[in-house]
Swiss-Prot record:
Tissue expression profile of the protein: Expressed only in seeds.
Source organism: Arabidopsis thaliana
One matching Pfam family: Jacalin
A GO term for molecular function: lyase activity
Positions contributing to Fe(2+) binding: 387, 391, 395
EC number(s) per entry: 4.8.1.5
Protein name as catalogued: Thiohydroximate-O-sulfate sulfur/sulfate-lyase (nitrile-forming) NSP2
InterPro entries linked to this entry: Jacalin-like_lectin_dom, Jacalin-like_lectin_dom_plant, Jacalin-like_lectin_dom_sf, Kelch-typ_b-propeller, Kelch_1, NSP1/2/3
Activity regulation field: The presence of Fe(2+) supports lyase activity in a dose-dependent manner with both benzylglucosinolate and 2-propenylglucosinolate as substrates. More active at pH 7.4 than at pH 6.
The protein's required cofactors: Fe(2+)
Length: 471
């Protein structure tokens, strides 16, 4: 489906329309005295190349070129328009920047000045607008795939046995038909225990796992845990005096802990970081050290038993804690987080190229937040809840918390809100600082969420599952 998005900018000048094609291959932009004087686009239509007309008037400054790779396409145009006063007042486009799906970004053509506008929503396949001897406005044709909305449902999972009880700032991971929980607090900044709890999905019963080997020496909060195969991997977290844990594995078949990296030998000790894994690597991103917030990404290969520090994201990705971190189709995604305030940007790391890309998303975007629940189903990243404003007492207080279930399609870069009218009673209460993992319950894959901090500053001890019916 191709949608014509109205032109943004001024309302004077001759109307022009290039139409819609299969994609945009080249962009030419010429600057003038006051802003963008000239644009021209080359398109691809099947096996044919279509060259659009020159829009505006080329000046002695010439034109700059932005080329799109054959296996890529433009998904985002950022521009600015402003009024220029002279013999007559006219509104012109002062700046244009183009970004592709794979992260290739043009330089900003022109001088950033005026009112910002954005053209996005899918694959951009054509342009239209108004011009005289300058460019007054720009719109686009955008192709959006007719993909079905992700469908699912929240259920509250029955719990029996000796469980973790109410807590937040802990983590969970699933191995087979068991969910494991480790760390956390009931009272702010006071870790509860260092038991490893195990929930049997067949009997819906909690118990404390027997533990041998190098049992972690600290009860901790702000800890992170992931699973690969039959093993759990636990990194970081702190106690009340801000001592930190190292990096451990737990063999769920032997109930045996192993210290893989002492705290002084691995990545910077931290808490409230983010962790995820693929088949061979554990990834650790960001978090809060004893002195500063971080934005480094470290990878531990479980075959080589070695840590590698990946490239550090550029300036567009700020230091942060409480971000979502997920692996989707081989790439590592950083979603939102807290850098002194809540942020709503998304970044993607490609391990094969050791390269970061800031991703521009659209749709029913959740507002800026951190310490939310997250999971991956297919190409979608699911999120629920989180903190949307820090408490004046920092971690001692609840902050302003949120609810809402959202999905980010990592191919179209579109957010959708999944909550349905009439099903509010089945949706978990608003919360943040909960533990979450991608899990499978009763044959469905989805988001498993346990505990968290309530708006009253109490702690939850409930277990919820958002099972996906279709994607």
């Amino acid at each position: 489906m191709v949608q014509k998005v109205e032109a943004r900018g001024g309302e004077i000048g001759d109307v022009w329309d290039d139409g819609a094609y299969d994609g945009v291959r080249k962009v030419y932009v010429g600057q003038g005295e006051d802003g963008i004087a000239f644009v021209k686009f080359e398109y691809v239509n099947g096996s044919q190349e279509v060259v659009g007309d020159e829009r505006g008037k080329k000046t002695l400054l010439g034109a700059e070129e932005f080329e799109v790779d054959p296996d890529d396409y433009i998904v985002y145009v950022e521009g600015y328009h402003e009024k220029v006063f002279g013999v007559t007042t006219k509104e012109i486009i002062s700046t244009l920047t183009f970004k592709t799906y794979k992260g290739k970004t043009s330089p900003p053509f022109g001088i950033v000045s005026g009112t910002k506008f954005v053209l996005q929503g899918g694959k951009i396949v054509g342009f239209h607008g108004r011009s005289t001897d300058v460019l007054h406005s720009l719109g686009a044709y955008i192709s959006s795939p007719a993909t079905p909305k992700l469908r699912g449902k929240w259920i509250k999972v029955e719990q029996k046995g000796e469980g973790p009880g109410p807590r937040c700032s802990h983590d969970i991971a699933q191995v087979g038909n068991k969910i494991f929980s480790f760390g956390g607090e009931l009272t702010p900044n006071q870790p509860i225990d260092k038991h490893l709890y195990v929930f049997d999905l067949e009997t819906r019963t909690w118990s404390i796992s027997p533990a041998t080997g190098d049992v972690p020496n600290l009860s901790c909060l702000g800890v992170r845990m992931v699973s690969i195969g039959s093993s759990l991997y636990v990194f970081g977290g702190r106690d009340a005096s801000r001592k930190y844990n190292g990096f451990y594995s737990f063999d769920t078949t032997k109930n045996e802990w192993k210290l893989l990296t002492p705290v002084e030998q691995g990545p910077t000790p931290r808490s409230f970081h983010s962790m995820t894994a693929d088949e061979n690597n554990v990834y650790v991103f960001g978090g809060v050290s004893a002195t500063v917030r971080l934005k480094t990404l470290d990878a531990y290969n479980i075959v080589d038993h070695k840590w590698v520090q990946c490239s550090t994201p550029g300036g567009s990705c700020s230091v942060r804690g409480g971000a979502g971190l997920e692996v989707v189709q081989g790439k590592v995604w950083v979603v939102y987080g807290f850098n002194g305030c809540e942020v709503d940007d998304v970044h993607c790391y490609d391990p094969a190229q050791d390269k970061w890309t800031q991703v521009e998303t659209f749709g029913e975007k959740p507002c800026a937040r951190s310490v939310f629940a997250s999971a991956v189903v297919g190409k979608h990243i699911l999120v629920f809840g989180g903190e949307i404003a820090m408490d004046p007492k920092a971690h001692e207080g609840p902050g302003q918390l949120s609810g809402g279930t959202f999905a980010l399609d990592t191919e179209t870069l579109k957010w959708e809100k999944l909550d349905k009218l009439g099903e509010e009673e089945e949706t978990p209460s608003i919360r943040g600082w909960s533990a979450s993992t991608t899990g499978t319950i009763d044959g469905k894959k989805g988001l498993v969420m346990f505990g968290g901090k309530a708006q009253t500053n109490d702690r939850f001890g409930d277990l919820f599952f958002y099972g996906v019916d279709s994607a």
